[in-house]
Amino acid sequence: MKNIIVYPFAILIACFCLFGGCTSTTNQVDIQVNRMPGVLPQLIFACDLSTDSAEILLSRPEVINDLKLLHYGIALSIPEYDSGRAKIVQHLNQEDIPVTAWLVMPSKLGYYFNASNASEAPGRFADFETWTATYKLRWASVGLDIEPGLTDFVVLQKGGKLKLLVKVIGRSLSLERKHQAQAARQTYDSLIQWMKKDGYSPQTYQLLFMADERKAQSMILDRIFGIVPAKGGLEALMVYSSFNHVGPALVYSYGKEAAAISIGSTSGGDDSSLNNQFRPLNWQEFSNDLICASHFTHTIGVYSLQGCLQQDFLSRLKSFDWNQTVLIPAKSIDKVAHFRKVVGILIWVLSYWIYMVIIVILLIVLFFWIWRARRIKRKKMKG
């Protein structure tokens, strides 16, 4: 289950780094960051463990006591609408711990919500409402995890850079993918309005690249990866600095464009090779990201609960100084600025490369026509 979170970020970061490095090209200065004034932020800890493991973890008295003391919530993934998952939610309801229904698809449908399975989403939510009513469950909010399907990640992971490039180019040209993305946006927008109508507080969990796509005024990532910029709910950008360890600079850059921020990852996956490359955040990195995220929003998601417990983060938060200042080094700001510049260029190229190819072909044809016309003219003059 842990690899479900690790693979998307690892592979997508590889996609965007395919044509660009991470060297800095701008001149920045160190930045000091504090949390925004007012009430302390609410943390929501994501838990995507199996039912048995989640039940054991969330039955621990010290975990429940810490969550209640700190007024923090849980986002529990709901891959199946069964009695086991319902029992966990009922326990959290009894303890007055806010629970977010982290909605996902069954694994056979790709696990994440996206353009490819959008037609199944309304039925999935209808089943959720039936399940909720059956077990009398209470929800603080309901979240849609919108990411590319797991099958896409497996294909991209095993195919190598050349196969990845071919697939990306093919999808960027596909009118079918374009129409699918447009239809999916309407479906998810309508679904979010349905959630609101039925009294839920909807959220969407989006990859951080969604902010770059918006800035470029493009829909190319929707077409290539199937992600959908659904509107109407609280959008949380998943800004996981554990995949590049540039510190809070990543959160600082994307936080300006986020209504809510999810930070992580505090836990590794089942794949040791990925763990070596994308190690979990340590306490210093985690606490710096927390302060930086709190500079922009009162709602902060944390992936994952199990990782925080393994590293004793939850307990340490009881004495955490939310008024501390975090220094973001200029070097880290430079790296993130360059990374986002590369991402922006790639989005632009992927959006318009076919037009550039057509222009180049036309220029070649024009050059050949001029060359041929001059050659014919010279022959006539000689004759």
Predicted regions located by residue number:
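Aromatic- and acid-rich polysaccharide-binding/catalytic face
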Residues: Y72, L76, M219-L250
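Substrate-binding cleft of secreted/luminal carbohydrate-active enzymes
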Residues: G232-P248, A260-I364, F368
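Active-site groove signature of glycoside hydrolases
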Residues: F128-E176, G301
